[in-house]
Amino acid sequence: MWQMVFAILAVGIFGGMAAHFLRSAGGGANIVLAPAEEEGAGDGEDAVEKLEALADGGSWREVWWALPAVAFQRVRNPAPLALAAFAGICWLIFCCQAAQVRGVRDAKLWLMLGGFAMGCLSIWPTHFFSMWLERRLGLEESAELVEGIRFFVVGVGLPEEGAKLLCFVPLIPLLLWVRGDLIAMMTAASVGLGFAFIENVTYFHGSSGLEAVGRYLTANPFHMTLTGLAGLALYRAARDPKGWGPQALLVFGLMVAAHGLYDAAIVVPAFGEFSLVGMIAFALVVYQFFRELRDLRSPSSEPVSLSATFLAGTSLVMAATFAYVSWQLGFQAACDALAGQVLSMSLMAYLFLREMPETMVTV
Protein backbone atom coordinates (compact mmCIF):
# COMPACT_ATOMS: atom_id res chain seq x y z
CA MET A 1 0.00 0.00 0.00
CA TRP A 2 2.73 2.46 0.92
CA GLN A 3 4.58 1.60 -2.29
CA MET A 4 1.47 2.78 -4.14
CA VAL A 5 1.49 6.05 -2.18
CA PHE A 6 5.16 6.76 -2.91
CA ALA A 7 4.72 5.85 -6.58
CA ILE A 8 1.82 8.28 -6.96
CA LEU A 9 3.74 11.06 -5.22
CA ALA A 10 6.77 10.40 -7.44
CA VAL A 11 4.58 10.75 -10.52
CA GLY A 12 3.31 14.04 -9.09
CA ILE A 13 6.87 15.33 -8.65
CA PHE A 14 7.77 14.45 -12.23
CA GLY A 15 4.50 16.01 -13.35
CA GLY A 16 5.42 19.18 -11.48
CA MET A 17 8.82 19.28 -13.19
CA ALA A 18 7.17 18.84 -16.58
CA ALA A 19 4.66 21.59 -15.79
CA HIS A 20 7.50 23.89 -14.72
CA PHE A 21 9.41 23.32 -17.96
CA LEU A 22 6.28 23.94 -20.03
CA ARG A 23 5.68 27.11 -18.07
CA SER A 24 9.27 28.26 -18.61
CA ALA A 25 8.98 27.50 -22.31
CA GLY A 26 6.16 30.01 -22.62
CA GLY A 27 3.23 27.67 -22.24
CA GLY A 28 1.08 30.51 -20.99
CA ALA A 29 0.61 29.29 -17.44
CA ASN A 30 -1.44 32.16 -16.23
CA ILE A 31 -3.74 32.62 -19.19
CA VAL A 32 -6.53 30.51 -17.72
CA LEU A 33 -5.28 29.81 -14.21
CA ALA A 34 -4.56 33.13 -12.58
CA PRO A 35 -7.61 34.62 -10.89
CA ALA A 36 -6.43 38.18 -11.33
CA GLU A 37 -6.37 37.87 -15.09
CA GLU A 38 -9.64 36.06 -15.59
CA GLU A 39 -11.78 37.80 -18.15
CA GLY A 40 -15.00 39.12 -16.75
CA ALA A 41 -13.71 39.63 -13.21
CA GLY A 42 -15.06 43.18 -13.23
CA ASP A 43 -18.47 41.97 -14.37
CA GLY A 44 -18.54 39.53 -11.46
CA GLU A 45 -17.81 42.31 -8.97
CA ASP A 46 -20.58 44.43 -10.48
CA ALA A 47 -23.01 41.50 -10.17
CA VAL A 48 -22.13 41.09 -6.48
CA GLU A 49 -22.64 44.79 -5.83
CA LYS A 50 -26.04 44.71 -7.55
CA LEU A 51 -27.01 41.65 -5.52
CA GLU A 52 -26.01 43.34 -2.26
CA ALA A 53 -28.02 46.41 -3.24
CA LEU A 54 -31.09 44.27 -3.92
CA ALA A 55 -30.70 42.56 -0.54
CA ASP A 56 -30.27 45.90 1.25
CA GLY A 57 -33.49 47.05 -0.40
CA GLY A 58 -35.38 43.95 0.71
CA SER A 59 -36.03 42.73 -2.85
CA TRP A 60 -35.70 39.10 -1.87
CA ARG A 61 -37.45 37.60 -4.89
CA GLU A 62 -35.01 39.39 -7.20
CA VAL A 63 -32.12 38.30 -4.96
CA TRP A 64 -33.19 34.65 -5.23
CA TRP A 65 -33.27 34.65 -9.03
CA ALA A 66 -30.10 36.72 -9.41
CA LEU A 67 -28.08 34.51 -7.05
CA PRO A 68 -27.12 31.62 -9.39
CA ALA A 69 -25.14 33.89 -11.73
CA VAL A 70 -23.07 35.09 -8.76
CA ALA A 71 -22.88 31.85 -6.76
CA PHE A 72 -21.68 29.78 -9.71
CA GLN A 73 -19.57 32.37 -11.55
CA ARG A 74 -16.24 30.77 -10.57
CA VAL A 75 -17.28 27.46 -12.15
CA ARG A 76 -16.50 28.98 -15.55
CA ASN A 77 -12.76 28.90 -14.77
CA PRO A 78 -11.67 25.44 -16.00
CA ALA A 79 -8.46 24.93 -14.01
CA PRO A 80 -9.74 25.30 -10.42
CA LEU A 81 -12.94 23.55 -11.53
CA ALA A 82 -10.95 20.53 -12.70
CA LEU A 83 -8.86 20.38 -9.51
CA ALA A 84 -11.93 20.71 -7.27
CA ALA A 85 -13.79 18.08 -9.32
CA PHE A 86 -10.85 15.68 -9.05
CA ALA A 87 -10.77 16.06 -5.26
CA GLY A 88 -14.54 15.64 -5.07
CA ILE A 89 -14.49 12.50 -7.21
CA CYS A 90 -11.81 10.92 -5.00
CA TRP A 91 -13.97 11.41 -1.91
CA LEU A 92 -17.10 10.28 -3.78
CA ILE A 93 -15.38 7.02 -4.72
CA PHE A 94 -14.52 6.56 -1.05
CA CYS A 95 -18.18 7.16 -0.11
CA CYS A 96 -19.44 4.68 -2.71
CA GLN A 97 -17.14 2.01 -1.33
CA ALA A 98 -18.16 2.88 2.24
CA ALA A 99 -21.82 2.49 1.21
CA GLN A 100 -20.96 -0.92 -0.29
CA VAL A 101 -22.17 -0.03 -3.79
CA ARG A 102 -21.99 -3.21 -5.88
CA GLY A 103 -22.18 -1.94 -9.45
CA VAL A 104 -23.44 0.61 -11.93
CA ARG A 105 -26.98 -0.75 -11.68
CA ASP A 106 -27.03 -0.51 -7.89
CA ALA A 107 -29.68 2.03 -6.82
CA LYS A 108 -27.35 3.19 -4.05
CA LEU A 109 -24.91 4.58 -6.63
CA TRP A 110 -27.58 6.72 -8.27
CA LEU A 111 -28.89 7.94 -4.93
CA MET A 112 -25.41 9.12 -4.02
CA LEU A 113 -24.85 10.78 -7.40
CA GLY A 114 -28.20 12.50 -6.94
CA GLY A 115 -27.08 13.59 -3.50
CA PHE A 116 -23.86 15.04 -4.93
CA ALA A 117 -25.84 17.00 -7.53
CA MET A 118 -28.23 18.32 -4.88
CA GLY A 119 -25.22 19.36 -2.81
CA CYS A 120 -23.91 21.39 -5.74
CA LEU A 121 -27.28 23.15 -5.96
CA SER A 122 -27.34 23.80 -2.20
CA ILE A 123 -24.85 26.64 -2.65
CA TRP A 124 -27.80 28.65 -4.04
CA PRO A 125 -30.08 28.59 -0.96
CA THR A 126 -26.99 28.84 1.26
CA HIS A 127 -26.12 32.28 -0.10
CA PHE A 128 -29.76 33.35 0.10
CA PHE A 129 -30.20 32.26 3.72
CA SER A 130 -26.88 33.83 4.65
CA MET A 131 -27.74 37.21 3.12
CA TRP A 132 -31.20 37.17 4.70
CA LEU A 133 -29.92 36.28 8.18
CA GLU A 134 -27.17 38.89 8.06
CA ARG A 135 -29.68 41.64 7.38
CA ARG A 136 -32.47 40.30 9.55
CA LEU A 137 -30.29 39.76 12.63
CA GLY A 138 -27.63 42.40 11.97
CA LEU A 139 -24.86 39.81 11.72
CA GLU A 140 -21.36 41.07 10.98
CA GLU A 141 -17.98 39.37 11.12
CA SER A 142 -16.23 40.48 14.29
CA ALA A 143 -12.83 40.08 15.93
CA GLU A 144 -14.54 39.85 19.34
CA LEU A 145 -15.08 36.37 20.77
CA VAL A 146 -18.84 36.35 21.44
CA GLU A 147 -19.84 38.33 18.34
CA GLY A 148 -17.43 36.32 16.21
CA ILE A 149 -18.90 33.01 17.39
CA ARG A 150 -22.42 34.36 16.87
CA PHE A 151 -21.61 35.35 13.29
CA PHE A 152 -20.06 32.02 12.34
CA VAL A 153 -22.65 29.85 14.09
CA VAL A 154 -25.77 31.76 13.00
CA GLY A 155 -24.48 33.44 9.84
CA VAL A 156 -22.36 30.60 8.42
CA GLY A 157 -23.07 27.28 10.13
CA LEU A 158 -26.87 27.63 10.19
CA PRO A 159 -27.42 28.63 6.53
CA GLU A 160 -24.89 26.13 5.17
CA GLU A 161 -26.11 23.15 7.20
CA GLY A 162 -29.74 24.18 6.74
CA ALA A 163 -29.41 24.49 2.96
CA LYS A 164 -27.60 21.16 2.62
CA LEU A 165 -30.22 19.39 4.71
CA LEU A 166 -33.01 21.09 2.74
CA CYS A 167 -31.51 19.75 -0.49
CA PHE A 168 -31.29 16.29 1.07
CA VAL A 169 -35.03 16.24 1.85
CA PRO A 170 -36.22 15.40 -1.73
CA LEU A 171 -34.16 12.19 -1.57
CA ILE A 172 -35.76 10.92 1.64
CA PRO A 173 -38.80 9.28 -0.05
CA LEU A 174 -36.44 7.26 -2.26
CA LEU A 175 -34.33 6.34 0.75
CA LEU A 176 -37.43 5.20 2.64
CA TRP A 177 -38.23 2.97 -0.33
CA VAL A 178 -34.69 1.54 -0.54
CA ARG A 179 -34.45 1.38 3.28
CA GLY A 180 -31.13 1.37 5.06
CA ASP A 181 -29.37 3.66 7.53
CA LEU A 182 -26.02 3.21 5.77
CA ILE A 183 -27.16 4.44 2.36
CA ALA A 184 -29.12 7.26 4.02
CA MET A 185 -26.00 8.50 5.80
CA MET A 186 -23.76 8.15 2.75
CA THR A 187 -26.31 9.86 0.47
CA ALA A 188 -26.44 12.77 2.90
CA ALA A 189 -22.64 12.74 3.01
CA SER A 190 -22.64 13.02 -0.79
CA VAL A 191 -24.79 16.16 -0.49
CA GLY A 192 -22.08 17.61 1.74
CA LEU A 193 -19.42 16.67 -0.81
CA GLY A 194 -21.35 18.39 -3.59
CA PHE A 195 -21.46 21.58 -1.55
CA ALA A 196 -17.74 21.33 -0.75
CA PHE A 197 -16.94 20.82 -4.45
CA ILE A 198 -18.57 24.11 -5.49
CA GLU A 199 -17.08 25.93 -2.50
CA ASN A 200 -13.62 24.58 -3.32
CA VAL A 201 -13.72 26.02 -6.84
CA THR A 202 -13.83 29.50 -5.31
CA TYR A 203 -11.04 28.76 -2.82
CA PHE A 204 -8.77 27.19 -5.45
CA HIS A 205 -9.49 30.09 -7.79
CA GLY A 206 -8.21 32.58 -5.24
CA SER A 207 -5.19 30.62 -3.97
CA SER A 208 -3.65 29.23 -7.18
CA GLY A 209 -4.49 25.76 -5.88
CA LEU A 210 -2.36 26.06 -2.73
CA GLU A 211 -5.32 25.17 -0.50
CA ALA A 212 -6.21 21.98 -2.36
CA VAL A 213 -4.40 19.51 -0.10
CA GLY A 214 -5.53 21.19 3.11
CA ARG A 215 -9.16 21.42 2.06
CA TYR A 216 -9.13 17.82 0.80
CA LEU A 217 -8.45 16.66 4.35
CA THR A 218 -10.51 19.30 6.18
CA ALA A 219 -13.35 21.03 4.31
CA ASN A 220 -14.34 18.06 2.14
CA PRO A 221 -14.64 15.50 4.95
CA PHE A 222 -16.06 18.08 7.37
CA HIS A 223 -18.97 18.90 5.06
CA MET A 224 -19.32 15.19 4.30
CA THR A 225 -19.53 14.15 7.96
CA LEU A 226 -21.66 17.09 9.14
CA THR A 227 -24.32 16.51 6.51
CA GLY A 228 -24.01 12.73 6.80
CA LEU A 229 -24.84 12.75 10.51
CA ALA A 230 -27.60 15.36 10.21
CA GLY A 231 -29.09 13.56 7.21
CA LEU A 232 -29.03 10.18 8.96
CA ALA A 233 -30.88 11.67 11.95
CA LEU A 234 -33.45 13.28 9.63
CA TYR A 235 -33.97 10.01 7.75
CA ARG A 236 -34.54 8.18 11.03
CA ALA A 237 -36.99 10.90 12.09
CA ALA A 238 -38.91 10.49 8.82
CA ARG A 239 -39.10 6.76 9.51
CA ASP A 240 -40.01 7.15 13.19
CA PRO A 241 -41.08 10.76 13.96
CA LYS A 242 -41.95 10.19 17.62
CA GLY A 243 -38.80 8.28 18.44
CA TRP A 244 -36.31 10.29 16.39
CA GLY A 245 -37.88 13.73 15.83
CA PRO A 246 -36.37 15.48 18.90
CA GLN A 247 -33.02 13.75 18.38
CA ALA A 248 -32.90 14.91 14.75
CA LEU A 249 -33.33 18.52 15.91
CA LEU A 250 -30.62 18.03 18.53
CA VAL A 251 -28.19 16.53 16.01
CA PHE A 252 -28.84 19.36 13.55
CA GLY A 253 -28.20 21.94 16.27
CA LEU A 254 -24.95 20.22 17.26
CA MET A 255 -23.77 20.12 13.64
CA VAL A 256 -24.51 23.83 13.22
CA ALA A 257 -22.62 24.62 16.44
CA ALA A 258 -19.65 22.43 15.47
CA HIS A 259 -19.47 24.05 12.04
CA GLY A 260 -19.62 27.56 13.48
CA LEU A 261 -17.03 26.87 16.18
CA TYR A 262 -14.64 25.31 13.67
CA ASP A 263 -14.79 28.36 11.38
CA ALA A 264 -14.69 30.86 14.25
CA ALA A 265 -11.63 29.21 15.81
CA ILE A 266 -9.78 29.69 12.52
CA VAL A 267 -10.84 33.27 11.78
CA VAL A 268 -11.64 35.07 15.06
CA PRO A 269 -8.41 36.44 16.64
CA ALA A 270 -9.96 36.51 20.12
CA PHE A 271 -9.85 32.71 20.28
CA GLY A 272 -6.07 32.96 20.64
CA GLU A 273 -4.64 29.92 22.38
CA PHE A 274 -8.11 28.36 22.54
CA SER A 275 -8.27 27.98 18.76
CA LEU A 276 -7.76 24.25 19.37
CA VAL A 277 -11.50 24.17 20.12
CA GLY A 278 -12.13 24.19 16.37
CA MET A 279 -10.03 21.10 15.76
CA ILE A 280 -11.68 19.35 18.69
CA ALA A 281 -15.08 20.02 17.12
CA PHE A 282 -13.78 18.69 13.80
CA ALA A 283 -12.35 15.54 15.40
CA LEU A 284 -15.54 14.80 17.36
CA VAL A 285 -17.74 15.07 14.26
CA VAL A 286 -15.40 12.85 12.22
CA TYR A 287 -15.19 10.34 15.08
CA GLN A 288 -18.98 10.09 15.39
CA PHE A 289 -19.41 9.68 11.63
CA PHE A 290 -16.93 6.82 11.42
CA ARG A 291 -18.40 5.25 14.53
CA GLU A 292 -21.78 5.14 12.76
CA LEU A 293 -20.06 3.83 9.63
CA ARG A 294 -18.42 0.96 11.50
CA ASP A 295 -21.72 -0.01 13.11
CA LEU A 296 -23.77 0.19 9.90
CA ARG A 297 -21.44 -1.55 7.44
CA SER A 298 -21.96 -5.28 7.08
CA PRO A 299 -18.76 -7.38 7.35
CA SER A 300 -17.37 -8.22 3.92
CA SER A 301 -14.07 -9.05 2.30
CA GLU A 302 -13.02 -6.35 -0.16
CA PRO A 303 -10.11 -6.56 -2.61
CA VAL A 304 -9.27 -2.93 -1.76
CA SER A 305 -9.73 -1.61 1.78
CA LEU A 306 -11.24 1.76 2.63
CA SER A 307 -7.86 2.77 4.05
CA ALA A 308 -6.19 2.03 0.72
CA THR A 309 -8.85 4.00 -1.15
CA PHE A 310 -8.38 6.94 1.21
CA LEU A 311 -4.59 6.88 0.86
CA ALA A 312 -4.81 6.58 -2.93
CA GLY A 313 -7.19 9.54 -3.15
CA THR A 314 -5.06 11.67 -0.84
CA SER A 315 -1.89 10.84 -2.78
CA LEU A 316 -3.54 11.54 -6.14
CA VAL A 317 -4.82 14.93 -4.98
CA MET A 318 -1.38 15.81 -3.58
CA ALA A 319 0.26 14.82 -6.88
CA ALA A 320 -2.28 16.74 -8.97
CA THR A 321 -1.96 19.79 -6.71
CA PHE A 322 1.83 19.75 -6.98
CA ALA A 323 1.65 19.70 -10.78
CA TYR A 324 -1.01 22.43 -10.76
CA VAL A 325 0.96 24.74 -8.46
CA SER A 326 4.20 24.09 -10.39
CA TRP A 327 2.41 25.21 -13.54
CA GLN A 328 1.11 28.26 -11.72
CA LEU A 329 4.09 29.38 -9.65
CA GLY A 330 7.07 27.25 -10.65
CA PHE A 331 8.62 24.04 -9.30
CA GLN A 332 10.62 25.58 -6.44
CA ALA A 333 7.71 27.71 -5.28
CA ALA A 334 5.49 24.62 -5.31
CA CYS A 335 8.01 22.72 -3.17
CA ASP A 336 8.27 25.58 -0.67
CA ALA A 337 4.52 26.16 -0.47
CA LEU A 338 3.36 22.56 -0.20
CA ALA A 339 6.08 21.02 1.99
CA GLY A 340 4.69 22.59 5.15
CA GLN A 341 1.14 21.65 4.23
CA VAL A 342 2.05 18.00 3.72
CA LEU A 343 3.63 17.83 7.16
CA SER A 344 0.72 19.55 8.89
CA MET A 345 -1.88 17.46 7.05
CA SER A 346 -0.19 14.20 8.05
CA LEU A 347 -1.94 14.51 11.42
CA MET A 348 -5.29 14.76 9.66
CA ALA A 349 -4.49 11.68 7.58
CA TYR A 350 -3.61 9.83 10.79
CA LEU A 351 -7.00 10.78 12.26
CA PHE A 352 -8.84 9.28 9.30
CA LEU A 353 -6.73 6.13 9.16
CA ARG A 354 -7.33 5.56 12.85
CA GLU A 355 -11.11 5.76 12.44
CA MET A 356 -11.41 3.54 9.36
CA PRO A 357 -13.51 0.36 9.79
CA GLU A 358 -10.37 -1.75 9.14
CA THR A 359 -8.07 0.64 11.00
CA MET A 360 -4.35 0.50 10.23
CA VAL A 361 -3.33 2.19 13.48
CA THR A 362 -4.35 1.55 17.09
CA VAL A 363 -2.81 4.51 18.92
Give short role names for the model-derived ranges.
Residues 1-363:
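Hydrophobic alpha-helical segments at protein termini of multi-pass membrane proteins
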